């Protein structure tokens, strides 16, 4: 049986509960778009009241003017999926961690933190997962400029740009 998308009628009921949330009623596969402030409560309702017991994956998209978090949730009993999105400020992208409800989010949130610079509040171990601990940038951001590695006193340091001389 093919997985179905969460119905527009049920999405409309969620928007009644969370009036700042929206969805595209014309879309074939509508996503629930929420504020970062509402995200923890929305996620809790989706898990506890709507049966979304599995987080398939999460990722982030840099749209230059904002960072968009994208979560793919599944209700395994009803064979239903839902995409939840939240726009974050590019200058300081912050959102509550999903790990309290979905422990499997731990490593994916670390990856998004490392590569996109999103801070996940309440994350149990928020640190880099791919880049060196002292790496000064987030390489999947559209404003990324590769720092230049340099050895100083036997230690690797990162320069914001290449030295001119």
Where are the regions a protein language model picked out?
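Terminal low-complexity/charged segments
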Residues: 1-165
């Amino acid at each position: 049986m093919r997985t179905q998308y969460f119905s527009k009628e049920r999405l409309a009921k969620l928007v009644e509960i969370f009036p700042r949330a929206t969805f595209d009623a014309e879309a074939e596969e509508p996503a629930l778009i929420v504020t970062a402030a509402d995200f923890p409560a929305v996620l809790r309702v989706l898990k506890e009241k709507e049966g979304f017991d599995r987080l398939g994956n999460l990722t982030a998209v840099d749209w230059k003017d904002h960072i968009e978090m994208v979560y793919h949730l599944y209700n395994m009993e009803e064979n239903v999926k839902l995409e939840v999105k939240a726009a974050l400020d590019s200058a300081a992208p912050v959102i509550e961690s999903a790990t309290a409800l979905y422990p499997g989010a731990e490593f994916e949130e670390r990856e998004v933190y490392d590569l996109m610079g999103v801070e996940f509040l309440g994350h149990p171990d928020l640190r880099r997962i791919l880049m060196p601990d002292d790496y000064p940038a987030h390489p999947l951001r559209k404003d990324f400029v590769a720092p230049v590695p340099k050895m100083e006193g036997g230690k690797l340091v990162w320069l914001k740009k290449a030295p001119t001389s």
